[in-house]
Amino acid sequence: MPTTNQLVVNGRENKVRKQNAPALNLSFNTLTKSARKLPAPFKRGVCTRVATMTPKKPNSASRKYARVKLSNGMEITAYIGGEGHNLQEHSVVLIRGGRVKDLPGVRYHIVRGTQDLAGVANRKQGRSLYGAKKEKK
């Protein structure tokens, strides 16, 4: 335990917190060719690969994911939620934060119903996260 005098002279050092979604914090300036800190809730990117992955134990499935080259130059792995999708290579997508617990290295989600990714078809409840429009009566 430090003495009061030691604290006055040196002070306490703040803990550095690790970012959960670091790609959302950087923005790339094309004129100066430099990255700078500019946090954003979403980022746009282009799919470079669309594939499936098996989750960690004890789960079993084939989870859909996409490798995305973001507008800030970073390449990330993002999860495609919902049943069925129309993504292909070179599709433009919108990325939000949020990891997938049973897929190692997947720290982002792709937003459904925006850019080139359609919403989930025939979804009646919990439509907001899946980009599904309200059904007409």
Curated annotation (Swiss-Prot):
Q: Which GO terms describe its biological process?
A: translation
Alphabetized, the UniProt keywords read: Methylation, Ribonucleoprotein, Ribosomal protein, RNA-binding, rRNA-binding, tRNA-binding
Check the record and name the CDD domains matching this protein. Ribosomal_S12
3-methylthioaspartic acid sites (modified residues): D102
Q: Name one GO cellular component term.
A: small ribosomal subunit
The UniProt entry, under PROSITE patterns, shows: RIBOSOMAL_S12
Task: Write the signal peptide boundaries.
Answer: none
Which terms in the Gene Ontology molecular function aspect does this entry carry?
rRNA binding; structural constituent of ribosome; tRNA binding
Q: This protein's superkingdom? A: Bacteria
Q: HAMAP family of this UniProt entry?
A: Ribosomal_uS12_B
Record-stated family: Belongs to the universal ribosomal protein uS12 family.
On assembly, the entry states: Part of the 30S ribosomal subunit. Contacts proteins S8 and S17. May interact with IF1 in the 30S initiation complex.
Q: Describe the task this protein carries out.
A: With S4 and S5 plays an important role in translational accuracy. Interacts with and stabilizes bases of the 16S rRNA that are involved in tRNA selection in the A site and with the mRNA backbone. Located at the interface of the 30S and 50S subunits, it traverses the body of the 30S subunit contacting proteins on the other side and probably holding the rRNA structure together. The combined cluster of proteins S8, S12 and S17 appears to hold together the shoulder and platform of the 30S subunit.
Protein name per UniProt: Small ribosomal subunit protein uS12
